[in-house]
Amino acid sequence: MGPVSVLPSPQSLSTWEGDLAKMTHLQAGLSPDTIEKARLELNENPDILHQDIQQVRDMIITRPDIGFLRTDDAFILRFLRARKFHQADAFRLLAQYFQYRQLNLDMFKNFKADDPGIKRALIDGFPGVLENRDHYGRKILLLFAANWDQSRNSFTDILRAILLSLEVLIEDPELQINGFILIIDWSNFSFKQASKLTPSILKLAIEGLQDSFPARFGGVHFVNQPWYIHALYTLIKPFLKDKTRKRIFLHGNNLNSLHQLIHPEFLPSEFGGTLPPYDMGTWARTLLGPDYSDENDYTHTSYNAMHVKHTCSNLERECSPKPMKRSQSVVEAGTLKHEEKGENENTQPLLALD
């Protein structure tokens, strides 16, 4: 048998060069797997990418009542990805994005990490953001509900901190395609705290995340939820789309069902994972930075997403040691009870964001 060539054939090399030529600068930096995922799942076609973007941009004239403050290619592209390249749906989301900001001006005044309300929420761990992505390349966000000190943080400021965090994260084109998952730990969340979740503020959150933000949410997972969190379903149901209800899962303390969807190696020990307990200040230090000063405006238009990566890589070297703020889990980390799902276990989807 003759020698086996490890070099690509002229035909395969030509195909590879052709595929590479089709890539636009808007896909630069994406891994080959992510580019293929965008093609298969989102209908992203590099041959007509710029035409798709322009078709959305051409629709802006139909909504003179909305101030479209940003319309560059990269910005519009994230809305197309969020709506699987259905141009009309992408434009509707783009319009709702700016309309939501027009209707809630106070929420977006001083919309940066050093705003006192946003800063307090970030420092208190709203949201938590894990450094590593899951097996599908999704970014994992955490909310430890019992850490909500209502004398310190308003629900609106927590929502602002979450939206600002998403604005920073969505700059990464990999996350525009792979998306996010959210885990909410309801351990020790009191009935008194739950009573503050009024229909109006829940509606505000749903409109901001479900209807007005270009993120793909692969799931919202409730852990250790009490009975009165189940009761919230009747409050939020009128605000939900039918499709949306498929993406939140109520796991209770059944971590087996959680681990079937998110592998333990990607989770901190609070959720039965193999990672160390989550440090509640990690994401706040990432956004604010060890060299933070008043000159830094971390807004969704001026924040340099590369600063996040730089800061993450230098946290240990540049940050002074800080005591780790822990979640208020009912049980100690690493000892959460694994229960087999019974016939009556409520794992029905409750709420989802698409």
Curated annotation (Swiss-Prot):
Annotated CRAL-TRIO domain residues: 118-279
Entries under Gene3D superfamilies matching the protein: Alpha-tocopherol transfer (1.20.5.1200), CRAL-TRIO lipid binding domain (3.40.525.10), N-terminal domain of phosphatidylinositol transfer protein sec14p (1.10.8.20)
Keyword Nucleus listed: no
GO cellular component annotations of the record: clathrin-coated vesicle; early endosome membrane; endosome; trans-Golgi network
Residue ranges with Polar residues bias: 345-354
Keywords for this protein: Cytoplasmic vesicle, Endosome, Golgi apparatus, Lipid-binding, Membrane
Composition bias, Basic and acidic residues: 335-344
GO biological process, one term: lysosome organization
Residue span of region Disordered: 317-354
Keyword Membrane: yes
Task performed by this protein: Required for normal morphology of late endosomes and/or lysosomes in neurons. Binds phosphatidylinositol 3,5-bisphosphate (PtdIns(3,5)P2).
Misc. comment: Binding to PtdIns(3,5)P2 is not required for localization.
Subunit annotation: Forms a complex with clathrin heavy chain and gamma-adaptin.
Protein name: Clavesin-1
Gene: Clvs1
